[in-house]
Amino acid sequence: MEIKNIYLGAWFQRTSLHLKEFYYFLETGESKLPLEKEKLSYLHRELEVKNFSWQEREFFDRVWAKFDNLEMSFDEDGLILFKKEYQDLKTDCELLKEFYEERLSPVINYIYSLGAPLPKELAKLELILPYIIEVYQSDRKEVEKLFNQFGDSIQSVAESPEASLYFGQKFFLFNLKGEGIQIEPIVEILIFFREFSAQLNGYLQAHRTIWEKISQIRSQEVLRFKDFTSIRNSLMEVKQTLSFVEARLSQMEKFIAVRRTWSQNLENTLKLLSIYQFDTLANSQNYMTSLWKMTKDYADSTFNLLTILYQENIQREVDALKLVTIISLVISFSRLTEPLFSLNFIGSVLLVFVFAGIFYFGMRFWFRSRKFELR
C-alpha cells in the first residue's frame, strides 16, 4: 500500500469579497478594515506562508498557498482544503489539525470579525472534519489494519472502476486503482457535502431550541407586565438569529446549485462511490427554509402580541397622567379666589399635588403589576 497524501477540509459560507480580503492579508499582512495592525502582523508571521497565488477559475476563484509542510486552497464559496504529502500518518494528522486550529482559524476569525456576529444558538456548532487519506493499490486487510492502528474501523465501502472509498469515523480512505482519476475535486465535494449537512443539522437543533423558547412564553396562562422587557429582549435575540439563518439558508441554496454545475463531470463517479448528495441536501435545504419561515412567523406573532399588550398598558399610564393633570388644574383654578401667596392657597396647591402624585403612582403601580392572559 502506497500512502500518497492526507487531506483535511472545512466549509464556511463566504464570497469573492471575503476571498479578496484574505488574499490581501497574505500579500501585505494588513487589512483594509479597522483592525489592529499589531495583531494582524503577528497573525501573518505565525502563518508563515511561503508562497501564494490568486487563481481565476470558471466557477470559483481560488487562493492557493504553500506553507512549510502543507498546501491550502481557499475557494470563494468558502471551501478550504488542506493537503499534506504523507510522511507519518499520526504526525501528519496532528500537523494538519494544529495548523487549522492554531494558525489559520485565528486569522479567519479575526479578519472576518467585523459585521453581524454569529448568534449564540449557533456558536457551539462543531464542524465535522474527517481526515481523508489517498492511497494506491491497497486491499481491505491493509485498510483495516491502518484504521485499527488509530482506533477506527471500516463502517462501509463503496466501489467504482477507478477507486474504492472506505468510510470510518475518523478517516475516509480513497484507494486509487490507477492514475486516471483526479482525487482533489472528489475530496472537495465530499467535504462540501459533510459540512453542508452539518450546518443544516446545526440549524435544525437551533430551530428546536428557539421554538421551545417561544413555546415557553406562549404556554404561560398569564404574563406579568414587569417581565415584558426581559421577554422582549429575548425575542429580539431570537429575531436576530432568525434573520441570520434566513440569509444563510438563501446563500446555501445558491452555493449547492453552483457546486452541482461545477461537478457535473464527476456525477457518475460520485454516485458509484455513494457520496452523491446534491438532491438529498437540496431537499433538506428547502425543508429547513420552510421550517425557519414557520419559526419566524411564530416569533413575529408572539412579538407582535407582546408589543400590543405593552403599548396598551403604556397608553393607560399616559391616560392616567392626563386625568391627574386635568383634575389638578381644575382644583388649582378653583382656588384662584384665594390670595396668591396666602397659606390657604399654598396649602391647597400642595395638597392637590400630593394627592395627585399618590393617585398617579398608585395607578402606575397597578398598571405595572397587571397580568395579561395569553389564552
Language-model features: locations:
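Short linear motifs at secondary-structure transitions and domain/linker junctions
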Residues: 47-48, 54-60, 140-141, 147-152, ...
